[in-house]
Regions:
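Regulatory and partner-binding modules of innate immune sensors/adaptors
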Residues: 1-395
Length: 395
């Protein structure tokens, strides 16, 4: 028989616990002749229906749902905030979860279906996170309002589906006008689709919720910035085809982000849609400065061969440095050679400290053996108007 606990809750009868653990439906029905016995709980707050769901005893669950106590048992919540439905879904017991879902739907127990556990997850969150696509679609069909919930990490079902790359579920959720799309750390479902390179989901989001493409995460990155930094050219193309003005986003400039990762394909796609895309960060560093600093030789060559970006060769940052200054300062020998071969490169430019690229190079190495001779010998360029070789300029 059930006995009272210190908190006033009914402790589960040992025989009922044994029946639930073994899936013995016949013994459970015999015990159910005492009306209150089925409502007893274990110390974690689990009923016999919770226990049978946890252990995936499908027939035991079906038998309980035929009893008068079934509404109370289906609605019961354990100390983790789980209903039996949540207990089944969380553990990936799809068939048991489907049985409980159909029962709740038929009995119009919407609040049971919508219940969130102590971490804010509902049955749809858990089904998607475990990759159970058919169960997730069944849940959406039975109770579309599941799509509105976010957990304590601000994750919506749509965000989790996009992160898991489950296209069918994402598309179904997008059909629900009020479905949530937020994610952790300020991300949204479009960030997630971009991260996975899922052009199908990205295209659908752009059609139905185009404003998401301009939302920033906690690091101030929009889905556009993520597409560039993750080198997702196919997704970038989808975003730009929908709205080419996205190529002009600032903070940070997209060409500068592409320079950081050194992806020429991304830069080409950007310039294809936005031939005059911004190329300079707030401190005056161009994507050429950045590519040099990051050591991306192919990106440097791309810029040097680009009609749109040819003017960057002599541009100075906030310290008055050209890309050549940086290549010299950090001994980027191959880049020095490539920059030096530009006929329009002005090697006489002085930085804010009055120093030339040659000075930077000579002082970045052993003065007795200047590395400059390794970079197509720019140590003795044509003399500037002052008559002194560049490396002998007054500092």
């Amino acid at each position: 028989m059930a006995a009272g606990t210190m908190s006033g809750e009914a402790t589960m009868d040992r025989r009922l616990l044994a029946a639930a653990a073994s899936g013995d439906a016949a013994s459970m029905k015999q015990l159910a002749l005492d009306p209150g016995v089925l409502l007893g709980t274990t110390p974690p707050g689990n009923t016999c229906l919770h226990v049978s769901c946890i252990l995936e005893h499908e027939e035991f669950c079906r038998s309980i749902l035929t009893l008068d106590q079934s509404p109370a048992l289906v609605s019961a919540v354990n100390k983790d905030g789980e209903t039996p439905l949540l207990a089944a879904v969380t553990r990936g017991h799809v068939s048991v979860a489907s049985i409980l879902l159909r029962y709740c739907r038929d009995q119009q127990l919407s609040q049971v279906i919508l219940k969130q556990d102590k971490r804010g997850f509902n049955a749809l969150h858990h089904a998607i996170r475990r990759g159970h696509t058919m169960l997730a679609l069944e849940l959406i069909e039975a109770e579309p309002a599941l799509s509105k919930a976010v957990n304590k990490n601000d994750e919506s079902p749509m965000f989790i589906a996009a992160m898991r790359n489950i296209t069918d579920v994402c598309e179904k959720l997008l059909e629900i006008p009020y479905s949530a799309h937020s994610g952790t750390c300020g991300l949204n479902a479009l960030h997630a689709a971009v991260r996975n390179g899922n052009a199908v989901i990205a295209k659908r989001i752009m059609e139905l919720r185009p404003w998401l493409v301009r939302q920033q995460n906690e690091n101030k990155f929009t889905p556009m910035h993520l597409a560039v930094s993750e080198k997702r050219i196919d997704v970038l193309k989808v975003l730009l085809e929908h709205d080419s003005s996205l190529g002009y986003l600032i903070s940070p400039r997209l060409l500068c982000v592409a320079a950081i990762v050194g992806d020429v394909g991304v830069a080409r796609e950007l310039l294809k849609h936005c031939p005059d895309a911004p190329y300079c960060d707030p401190k005056g560093s161009t994507c050429l400065h950045i590519a040099v600093l990051c050591g991306h030789m192919e990106y440097v060559k791309f810029i040097l061969g680009s009609q749109q970006l040819g003017q960057l060769v002599n541009m100075q940052n906030s310290r008055g440095e050209t890309a050549l200054h940086l290549a010299a300062k950090f001994k980027k020998v191959e880049m020095l050679s490539a920059l030096r071969h530009r006929q329009d490169m002005d090697i006489t430019v002085l930085n804010s400290a009055g120093k030339s690229a040659n000075w930077e190079l000579l002082h970045a190495t052993n003065p007795a053996k200047p590395l400059i001779s390794m970079a197509d010998d720019i140590s003795s360029p044509p003399e500037p108007s002052g008559g002194l070789p560049v490396h002998q300029e007054t500092l």
